[in-house]
Amino acid sequence: MPPFAVPTELARRYDVCFKSIAIGKWVNLDMLAVRDPDVLIDEIDPEFYDEDERLPYWAEIWPSAIGLGRHLFEYPAPAGSRILELGCGIGLAGIAAAAAGLAVTACDYEEDALAFARYNARLNALDGRVSFRFLDWRNPDLDRKYAIVIGSDILYERPNHDPIQRLLHETLEKGGMFLASDPDRRAAAPFVESMIARGYRHSAQPRKVKFESKDNRVIVHRFLKAD
């Protein structure tokens, strides 16, 4: 049993379960998740999708988020560094960053995703290190800059590339770093090319992530903004 109850609204609307995810050598994160996210896709109203093309990808625990969380443990930023997470979903990567000693602002476009993420931060006793807020990266309303911005599996749709890059231009400090993990999708390649053309230095680290008995290939892209 969890140490405190699942919020009534989440328990009413979703079939939920708990999963334990190994992040660091001695660090496991317990995560409240949707048991079968595919059910949510099957239930989408086509008119609702056509209006804003919103699919419930936030409900998945993605191997890319696991890979990014592990990367943050293996290559730690200075303790207390303030970072911004884009598209946090149920919170795995941002909560992993908080467990690694970072001060995290995690954002998503879906209020239910943020509700899961807040619960998961509290579940792992990290709600004091991570805050959550709504963000539409097409119209960001951020009032500060960050040394580090992260995102897992957010490069899959090319129409999102330009809004993400504009947000990074406005939000990432000079000399700052953007970490983006991706399951080696072809859609990531034009994003990388565009970032390099904008003056970012790029490197990539492939990782193997085993999750739910399946081996997954994840690429952690590292972009450094010019000073």
What are these regions (language model features)?
Residues M1-D227:
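S-adenosylmethionine-dependent methyltransferases
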